[in-house]
Amino acid sequence: MMLAGKLFRDGQDNSGEVLDSNDLERERGITILSKNVSINWKGTKINILDTPGHSDFGGEVERVLNMADGCLLLVDAFEGPMPQTRFVLQKALQLGLKPIVVVNKVDKPNCRPEEVYEMVFDLMCDLDATEEQLDFTVVYGSAKNGWMSDEDRKSVV
């Protein structure tokens, strides 16, 4: 999204964790403090909010989600939903948000996008998602390689 929104200048290095600016966050590969970045996409301003996933940061998650109009649920195509996914997704669903599910890393060997899709659906059912929330949009792709597709999940692998 940040590439598409032209957050970076041509030729600017955009590798790494853009929103994880804290040394401890970069070292551990986790988000501790919520961050935001704004992009413009086809005349619409989109604020991207990165929240911590762990329940120890619950207050931070709730504070940020209360400002959101929607959410992206980013899930690894091999690992599927992680334990912290449950906590943040539950908070988002309770606030009435309808996630767009992003299954990332479908370019990796042994990825399981079909199974991960089912795992996300089952998790949302376990969290008492509404019928509307269960009718979520899903996209598949590789953030590392800079592409996403809303094609049928079997055709992108």
Residue ranges and their predicted role:
Residues 77-157:
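P-loop NTPase catalytic nucleotide-binding module
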